[in-house]
Amino acid sequence: MLLPDDYLRAVADAVHAVGGLFVLDCIASGALWVDMQACGIDVLISAPQKGWSASPCCALVMMSERALERVNATQSTSFACDLKKWLQIMQAYEQGGHAYHATMPCDALARFRDVMLETQAYGFDKIRDQQLELGQRVRALLTNKGFNSVAAAGFAAPGVVVCYTEDAGFKSGQKFAAQGLQTAAGVPLMCDEPADFQTFRIGLFGLEKLQNIERTVSTLEQALDKIERA
């Protein structure tokens, strides 16, 4: 599900009105970059996998000035989840120094850096437009094949497409796996859906998909055609 910018801004205003911090999870947002300042977001969290086409090796935490002030005033009782400490580690490296808190996955981090630079050179706006186009085309394909989207019109994310199904083979991903594609089962909505509720998810992340839209859509279409004929 994709939340429009005006929705995010409204949430931010409501949170700020009671002195809170607005934390937005963008791990599955793909290449839909979020303007933190325009949307009033205090903390944005993401990760190298999915939209960044890298290995899961760290957490990405971007903070507004409000969030930074709040973090610096905290005193954590956790070693691993002490955001203030990790912020100090990052600041040490940004200033050309070195600091140690735990052994880091250096090779994976270096690869992540390379992919970020590759994406920057390719163009952040360009890859965002391609994310939108790919999502729209895949959703149109699935609609034509008779699948209904879980997300309503206007809230359909282009990075993860979730559709209803009555076929356990689609939910489990077995039918896609038989055609060489990896999908995922949908997660429970936890809003009193019936016991026979079933969905499946198709992730549209990665430069290899976004930079090859025709190939990506064609591969999915061919797989669906073969499943229909089976």
Regions found by a protein language model. Name each.
Residues 1-18, 32-34, 213:
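Active-site core of PLP-dependent enzymes with the aminotransferase class I/II
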Residues 22-26, 44-47, 183-185:
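General beta-strand structural signal in soluble alpha/beta enzymes
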Residues 37-49, 59:
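Conserved active-site segment immediately N-terminal to the catalytic lysine
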Residues 52-140, 144, 208:
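Active-site C-terminal subdomain of aminotransferase-like
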Residues 148-179:
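Conserved PLP-binding catalytic core of the aspartate aminotransferase-like
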Residues 179-201:
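Conserved PLP cofactor-binding pocket of PLP-dependent enzymes
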